[in-house]
């Protein structure tokens, strides 16, 4: 297999293949938002894989963030993003080679870890597990209340202006709430660009003393950030989006969340995977990512 890293004038072809493998993944506006924003002063890297006969097989990208720890220390991480393997090349070991190449790229940039978000049922999870990844339990959670029509306790939802004062208050509250957890670290401008300045309309909402940021996509809402994932707050948000005849998806690194056995929610188990390289070879993952320290990664952190 042959690798071409950051090929010139390849965005449109890369996007076309993403949409072949993941129908309706997005348009060029989506591509630019995912791959061409700078976060932690780095743009995403991407590469393609060709056969020895120059037949296109697969592609993948790496975006960059910082994980911050309760100690105040942080580690820069690469995140496998937008990986695809064309149907003709499945079963050829392309994703295993994608992992190896991704490790090499982040290592060359002196980035400590290569990470990924995978569902438990996906073959990508097994490849990353077998490569030696440290595994953090996650859940994708999708409301199904339009079908179940379960009546939740009502809680008032107020839509706030996305002005500087309100966003700064939520940003500062986020930093306070995450002090004791492992989380993605942003400065204020990065926070706004990550959670507010997205592709579709976003809403900053308040429920009692709690706040949430949601994005309305054509098919459903996405809950990108919330100060509380209590049953009362989440069901209040579900009621609000149901009035618009849509459901909502969110993401949790709390495996003991309240939605596991509720017919109004579909829970899809998965993992946040963390893979070392030569930069972090002496790091004991079980010590750094101690089970005594919780992760808090939310849906809006993921891309």
Model-derived regions: residue spans:
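Conserved acetyl-CoA-binding loop-helix of GNAT-fold acetyltransferases
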Residues: 85, 90-106, 116, 230-242
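Active-site/acyl-donor-binding loops of N-acyltransferases
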Residues: 64, 117-156, 212-303
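Secondary-structure boundary elements
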Residues: 51-54, 104-112, 123, 134, ...
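Long, hydrophobic/aromatic-enriched structural stretches that serve as scaffold segments
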Residues: 61-71, 75-98, 102
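Conserved beta-strand in the GNAT
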Residues: 47-48, 55-65, 79, 84, ...
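Amide-forming acyltransferase catalytic core, primarily the GNAT-like/NAT-type
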Residues: 13-44, 107-109, 130-232
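Tryptophan-centric aromatic hotspots in well-structured domains and transmembrane helices
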Residues: 31-37, 95, 117, 293
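Non-cleavable N-terminal signal-anchor transmembrane helices
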Residues: 1-76
């Amino acid at each position: 297999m042959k690798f071409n890293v950051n090929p010139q004038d390849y965005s449109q072809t890369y996007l076309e293949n993403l949409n072949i493998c993941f129908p309706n993944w997005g348009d060029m506006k989506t591509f630019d938002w995912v791959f061409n924003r700078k976060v932690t002063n780095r743009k995403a890297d991407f590469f393609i894989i060709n056969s020895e006969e120059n037949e296109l097989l697969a592609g993948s990208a790496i975006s960059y963030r910082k994980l911050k720890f309760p100690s105040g220390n942080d580690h820069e991480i690469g995140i496998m993003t937008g990986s695809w393997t064309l149907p003709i090349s499945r079963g050829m070991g392309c994703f295993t080679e994608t992992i190896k190449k991704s490790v090499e790229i982040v290592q060359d940039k002196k980035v400590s870890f290569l990470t990924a978000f995978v569902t438990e049922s996906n073959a990508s999870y097994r490849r990353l597990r077998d490569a030696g990844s440290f595994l953090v339990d996650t859940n994708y959670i999708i409301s199904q209340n339009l079908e179940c029509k379960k009546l939740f306790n009502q809680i008032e939802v107020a839509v706030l202006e996305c002005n500087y004062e309100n966003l700064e208050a939520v940003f500062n509250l986020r930093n306070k709430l995450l002090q004791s957890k492992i989380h993605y670290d942003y400065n204020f401008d990065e926070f706004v660009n990550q959670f507010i300045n997205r592709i579709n309309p976003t809403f900053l909402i308040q429920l009692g003393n709690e706040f949430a940021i949601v994005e309305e996509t054509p098919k459903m809402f996405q809950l990108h950030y919330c100060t509380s994932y209590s049953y009362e707050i989440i069901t209040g948000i579900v009621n609000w989006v149901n009035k618009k005849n849509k459901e909502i998806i969110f993401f949790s690194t709390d495996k003991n969340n309240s939605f596991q056995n509720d017919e109004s929610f579909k829970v899809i188990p998965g993992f946040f995977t963390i893979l070392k390289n030569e930069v972090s070879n002496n790091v004991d993952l079980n010590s750094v990512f101690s089970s005594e320290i919780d992760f808090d990664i939310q849906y809006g952190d993921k891309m």
